[in-house]
């Protein structure tokens, strides 16, 4: 069953015409937000795959899940189909399951974090990032076994879960 979005405000968004200059300013602000996502991840990453090989991909998507800025396409649709809980303000989602996001991540070493963005109780966008973790408990160091017969030999397979709710850690996963 697909995810259910919980909004505390049901007021419709107002449509507004935007001139080309304002649109260009908004576009560049969104691209800058994505570059800032890059900078934060590079400064804080513990994984050499992210820190040294730049194997990570931040993305901002609109409320339908279509990529607005990024470089790898959107995986929101697949994630929402695989996650059977609610999406609420303050949630942060995590998955390492390539089958749970239409293959946007290619193996268990890629960890996907997804944050729905709300304004005044309404979902307006998604911010997401996935990056390559060096070792996630697979049968060989580095968790990239060339002779794996099933996905569980790569390491810990985390289905789509809500890691935080209202910015507090979700007890079963901590």
Model feature map: region roles:
Residues 75-84, 134-143:
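A short, polar/charged loop-to-alpha-helix boundary motif
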Residues 110-119, 128:
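A short, hydrophobic, proline-anchored segment that marks a local hinge/packing element in signaling
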Residues 101-108, 137:
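Short, Lys/Arg- and Gly-enriched loop/turn segments at beta-strand edges
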Residues 164-170:
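Conserved small/polar residues in nucleotide/adenosyl-binding loops
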Residues 2-77:
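Long, charge-dense accessory insertions within large macromolecular proteins
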């Amino acid at each position: 069953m697909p995810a259910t979005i919980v909004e505390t405000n049901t007021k419709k968004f107002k449509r507004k015409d935007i001139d080309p200059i304002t649109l260009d300013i908004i576009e560049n602000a969104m691209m800058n937000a994505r570059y800032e996502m890059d900078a934060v991840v590079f400064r804080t990453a513990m994984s050499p795959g992210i820190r040294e090989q730049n194997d990570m991909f931040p993305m901002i998507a609109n409320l339908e899940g279509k990529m607005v800025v990024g470089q790898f396409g959107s995986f929101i649709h697949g994630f929402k189909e695989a996650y059977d809980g609610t999406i609420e303000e303050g949630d942060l989602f995590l998955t390492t399951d390539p089958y749970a996001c239409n293959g946007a991540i290619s193996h268990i070493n890629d960890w996907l974090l997804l944050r729905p963005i709300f304004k005044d109780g309404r979902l307006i966008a998604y911010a997401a990032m996935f990056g390559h973790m060096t070792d996630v408990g697979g049968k060989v160091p580095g968790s990239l076994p060339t002779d794996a017969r099933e996905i569980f030999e790569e390491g810990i397979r985390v289905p789509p879960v809500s890691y935080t709710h209202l910015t507090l850690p979700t007890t079963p996963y901590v």
